[in-house]
Regions:
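Cell-envelope/ECM-targeting effectors and their regulatory/trafficking segments
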Residues: 12-30, 45-139
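Feature activates predominantly on carbohydrate-active enzymes
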Residues: 7-8
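Surface-exposed patches in mature extracellular/periplasmic domains of secreted proteins
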Residues: 28-38
Length: 139
């Protein structure tokens, strides 16, 4: 079930299936790992799925999708520390590929979906230094 229905961890069977399917589709259609996206990457104002419990990091280890190469231990010390200038973050986020907006509520939705994908340990509306460091490593 999704976020509105007691969002649960993906089963091992689901994870194995998505790995096998993704590998086959990548090979068949010559898809680059940068182009493997979730609903929330494409429509972050409307979608949250696949969400923070989706195994993006594992899929990256299987050479399926994009993930940052930073250690959680090194990044964690910046978690929750508010970024002084969030405009820099959003300029970089829009450069990364998210649709630009000046609407504050839309920016927060986009930001949270970026966190669901690349920093799933904490989903927050505070634009923090850890998320900025992760984004910088991807752009």
């Amino acid at each position: 079930p999704g976020h509105d229905y007691k969002y649960k961890n993906f089963s091992q069977k689901q994870i194995t299936s998505i790995i096998d399917l993704s590998k086959n589709l990548k090979k068949k259609y010559k898809i680059k790992k940068e182009n493997i996206l979730g609903h929330s990457d494409i429509a972050p104002l409307r979608k949250k799925d696949p969400g923070e419990k989706f195994p993006w990091k594992l899929l990256n280890k299987k050479k399926i999708c994009l993930w940052h190469n930073l250690s959680e231990k090194n990044c964690k010390k910046f978690r929750g520390i508010k970024l002084k200038n969030s405009d820099n973050f959003f300029q970089l986020l829009f450069k990364f590929g998210y649709k630009p907006t000046n609407n504050k509520n839309e920016k927060i939705k986009i930001y949270k979906n970026f966190q669901r994908r690349f920093r799933p340990q904490l989903i927050s509306s505070i634009v923090d230094q850890e998320t900025y460091i992760i984004l910088k490593s991807l752009v």
